[in-house]
Amino acid sequence: MPAEFARHSQTVICWPARSEIYGSRLAEAQTAHAALANTISGYEPVTMIANPQDLTAARNACAENVDVVALEIDDAWFRDSGPNYVIESGELIATCWTFNGWGEKFVPFDKDATIATRWAAHAGHKTRKINMVLEGGSLNVDGAGTLITTEQCLLHPNRNPKLSRDQIAERLCSELGQQRVVWLPFGLALDDDTDGHADNVAAFIGEKTVIMQGCDDKNEADFSRCATNISVAKDAGLTVHEIPVLPYVVTDSVRAAVPYLNFYICNDAVIVPVCGHDADSEMLALLGEFIPDRDIIGLEIGEILSRGGGGIHCITQQIPAI
């Protein structure tokens, strides 16, 4: 499985469709997804998947160079429902894992349970179905054999209760071409929707080199959780760069974190969720020091995406270049 920071042939995003999670702000979420697609399209090709009834609205909101296609979906978190791509013997393969709505929390999910294979068929990609529950946001790889994930998510009984930790690690390595799994204990404290996805706390930017989300407020549960994760990563031999500030927002009486770490690395740029926090400029500059060869772009869509339960990384999926 190539790293996210390797070259892409394109990015795939979905048009928000689940009004239950956004309520009266669904249109705002749709605008945010379009803004992200339009930004990424300045660096690489982008496809926007939309329900047939939303096709016109999506096309009107997206730039002309964004390809909008009609495929039925329940929700818009394509990082989790979409395929994880591997390259084997020079051939691109879409690995299509079992999707169960994040432990059957969000129903219905029958359309999202098949979107990986339907998208791959539309794109003409070879597929491999895998009988194990997995979301793409629960892992990250460095492209050199190391995969990072969280115990909180992958060992949760609502995912694969009959599989042991070792069995899960073995399956990840065999299907995604990895040599080892680094198990972080935690996701973020308020990440109840996904049970602690890794893409809120860790992102590889090089071989055995990872950026990790920290927290500078000792009164937050994430202060100790992030510190423990960082310690575990260092003990695993990883070079760790820390983003020390973790913003929180309250939207419609719901409190959520907006981690800078939930960024997306596309060709020649890093797109970062921001929410008007005092530290936004400083943290974007820090990311520029960690990743000096790419443009660092902050998009102020972090708050609305957090209302839906995720961030920029959660709604994107890269297709590796061959």
Where are these regions (language model features)?
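The feature marks the mature, well-folded catalytic cores of soluble enzymes
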Residues: 1-322
